[in-house]
Design a protein with these regions (language model features):
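C-terminal substrate-recognition "lid" of short-chain dehydrogenase/reductases
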Residues: 132, 176, 210-238
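Residue(s) in the substrate-gating loop at a strand-loop-helix junction
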Residues: 140
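Alpha-helical segment proximal to the catalytic Tyr-Lys
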Residues: 125, 169-173
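Conserved glycine-rich Rossmann-like NAD(P)H-binding loop of the short-chain dehydrogenase/reductase
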Residues: 26-43
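Conserved glycine-rich cofactor-binding loop
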Residues: 12-13
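Substrate-binding pocket helix/loop in short-chain dehydrogenase/reductase
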Residues: 96-97, 104-109, 198, 202
Length: 243
């Protein structure tokens, strides 16, 4: 059986892991990446391989182009090509903008936005050559409306949204769809800093009355990446009606 192949960046846990497992459960070979959490990445790899598909786990910096180039060399060698790219790698910075250092700004920009450029730049020629492919960028509602004390994070997600729309237009003639999921409050480790009072206040703002689950992002990501569709260039908000 010729399995299709997906690359998910930032897949050691949370949303990235949920997306990777969803595709694996549907018979896809999976490439997963992480920068620092090697043991968690290996655990995810074992879970994926237990589903009967092949999994390449790669430790490296998606924000570094040369590092990404080595990753894509490994993908070509092992799988031949790539059918779906999910740009999920990301970090947050919470604090006053006036206290942010240039190094902190550059770090979040490289991790959240430059990584998307790097992976898209390397994946697009592969997809164009086959006149087929899907690119899915994991964004945030803060990229739509902005968030106080998360200026840099909001800026990177807004950049991802703009890049999604522009790249979708450029790649549509090659039958490649590019979309983004703008997540609201998803119940992952990234939101574990909230204390009980803050969490309850947040839930009161969400019409659905709860935070989203990583598995729900995985389900939507699978639908967008696995089905033939006229849908491209869209920023799909998955936020329980919050924003």
């Amino acid at each position: 059986m010729n399995h299709k192949t997906i690359l998910v960046t930032g897949a050691s846990r949370g949303i990235g892991k949920a997306i990777a497992l969803t595709y694996a459960k549907n018979g896809w070979d999976v490439v997963i990446t992480c920068l620092r959490r090697e043991e968690e990445l290996k655990k995810t790899q074992r879970e994926i391989e237990a589903l009967g598909v092949s999994c390449l786990a790669w430790m490296g910096d998606a924000g570094d182009f040369e590092s990404c180039s080595r990753l894509f060399d490994a993908i070509r060698e092992r799988f031949g090509s790539l059918d779906v790219l999910v740009n999920n790698a990301g970090i947050s910075y919470i604090g006053l903008f006036q206290d942010m250092t240039p190094d902190e700004w550059n770090h979040i920009l490289n991790t959240n936005l430059t990584s998307v450029f790097n992976c898209c730049r390397l994946a697009v020629p592969m997809m164009v050559s086959h006149k087929s492919g899907r690119i899915l960028n994991i964004s945030s509602v803060w990229g739509v409306c902005g968030a106080s004390c998360e200026v840099a994070y909001s800026a990177t997600k807004g950049g991802i949204n703009a890049m999604t729309r522009a790249l979708a237009k450029e790649l549509a003639p090659s039958s490649i769809q590019v979309n983004a999921i703008a997540c609201g409050a998803i119940d992952t480790e990234m939101n574990q800093f909230l204390d009980e009072e803050e969490r309850n206040a947040l839930l009161e703002e969400i019409p659905a009355g709860r935070m989203g689950r990583a598995e729900e992002v995985g389900k939507l990501a699978y639908q967008l990446g696995s089905e033939d569709s006229y849908l491209t260039g869209q920023i799909i908000q998955l936020d329980g009606g919050w924003i």
